[in-house]
């Protein structure tokens, strides 16, 4: 069964080619398909950025920036702080995250990139979890598991070299 194939109000099946938002022929209510918010954190440390090796799909085994879905009731900063802690064991204050970028991501997501305050190298400890095989640093742009992460890291390091923001 295809996701969102039925009206969430009355259960009437939508035509597969019906555009979004979909107006139900059974009850006349409109159904919308909205993007899911994701928080991703750029955490500067020493001369690099913290990345994780994923232990779950998608992109299991690849390096990515820490992040994940924002839970209902969370601000993007709270979601970013929680995801960073869950995936790296590193705790930050939600107020130490500033908006870095917002992009459309894969699978109907809206990715909110937060830049954290730089942390000392001794904050990086060995860490694994259900979601994380490894936490490490990168000191230059590399290919990451998600193309969007690669683009943002490339921009971050370019701005670090030039001292200019907004590249």
Language model features with spans:
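Conserved hydrophobic "DFG−1" position in protein kinase catalytic cores
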Residues: 43-44, 51, 115, 137
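Short glycine/serine/proline-enriched coil/turn segments at secondary-structure junctions
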Residues: 32-33, 59, 106-107
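Conserved Nudix-box catalytic region and its N-terminal flanking loop in Nudix hydrolases
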Residues: 44-86
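A short Gly-Trp-Pro
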Residues: 66, 121-123, 167
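Unchanged
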Residues: 70-155, 159
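Acidic, metal-coordinating catalytic segment for phosphate/diphosphate chemistry
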Residues: 1-40
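Generic C-terminal helix-cap and adjacent flexible tail
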Residues: 159-167
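A generic structural signal for short beta-strands and their flanking turns/coil linkers
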Residues: 37-39, 59-61, 95
């Amino acid at each position: 069964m295809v996701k969102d194939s039925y009206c969430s109000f009355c259960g009437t099946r939508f035509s597969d080619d019906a555009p979004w938002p979909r107006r139900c022929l059974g009850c006349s209510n409109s159904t919308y398909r909205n993007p899911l918010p994701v928080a991703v954190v750029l955490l500067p440390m020493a001369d690099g950025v913290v990345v994780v090796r994923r232990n779950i799909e998608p992109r299991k085994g690849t390096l990515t920036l820490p992040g994940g879905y924002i839970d209902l009731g969370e601000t993007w900063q709270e979601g970013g702080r929680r995801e960073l802690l869950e995936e790296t064991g590193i705790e930050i204050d939600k107020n130490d995250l500033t908006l870095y970028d917002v992009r459309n991501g894969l699978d109907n997501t809206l990715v909110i990139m937060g830049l954290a305050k730089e942390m000392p190298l001794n904050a990086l400890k060995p860490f694994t979890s259900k979601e994380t095989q490894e936490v490490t640093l990168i000191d230059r742009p590399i290919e990451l598991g998600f193309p969007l992460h690669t683009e943002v890291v490339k921009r971050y390091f370019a701005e670090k070299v030039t001292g200019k923001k907004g590249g």
